[in-house]
Amino acid sequence: MKLINVFLLSLSFMLLFGCNKGAGTFTLEGVITDASFNQPLTGATVELYGISSGNNQYALVASAVTGEDGKYAFTFDRTRTEKYTLYVKKNQYFEQELEVYYSQLKLKEINIRNVTTAAKSWVEIKIFNNNAANNDHLQFIRQQGKIGCSECCFSGINHLYGFQDTSIFCINDGNSLYSIEYAVFGTSNTGILGVTTTPFDTTVLNLTY
């Protein structure tokens, strides 16, 4: 009887520590880079959310604020989570998000996820029409610049008719080129214009026709 009790006690310890070992923890680390100034991004808020299997609801797992080295580090329990989403936010910077699937994470290893973002900047496309006529037709399209964001300008061809002096504001990555290709119908006036936009500010791009 005594041997049976010892065996059962040993089995209980094995199950207890075996389960704890099986649960384990993940370590997720990385560096947030500021592409506008080519350096680590200080003071960025990094948040990790997990979506549980079956209910599609996100819950905050961990959060941190980057120091001068731009680094963040999370250690969190392995749970029944389908995937995680990493959010990077800072005022006057483009918010970034990165999906990290549960199947991609490894135990007993440091899982590296680096993220790059850029300072916000703006271009003012300032259009002047000299000697305007009702049948004037200007078209232009973005050739290079920020695309694919909720704040980004229309990516197709822009048309202006008749007498129109106007300004169009578009967002861009700071310290990056923003250029347009334009053409005035019925004339030889065509070309490409571009400026490098100043971070946190508005840079003027003049288009005269």
Language model: regions and residue ranges:
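Extracellular beta-sheet/turn segments enriched in Thr/Pro/Gly and aliphatic residues
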Residues: Y101-K120, E124, T190-Y209
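A short, amphipathic beta-strand motif
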Residues: L28-D34, G70, S121-N130
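A short, solvent-exposed loop/turn motif at the edges and junctions
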Residues: T79-L105, A183-G191
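Short, ordered, surface-exposed loop/turn motifs in non-cytosolic proteins
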Residues: F37-G54, N131-S150
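Short, acidic Ser/Thr/Gly-rich low-complexity loop/linker segments typical of extracellular
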Residues: G54-K71, I147-Q164
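Bacterial Sec-dependent N-terminal signal peptides
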Residues: M1-Q39
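Short strand-edge motifs at loop-to-beta-strand transitions and within beta-strands
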Residues: Y72-F74, N111-R113, D165-S167, T203
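Glycine-centered loop-to-beta-strand initiation motif
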Residues: G30, T66-D77
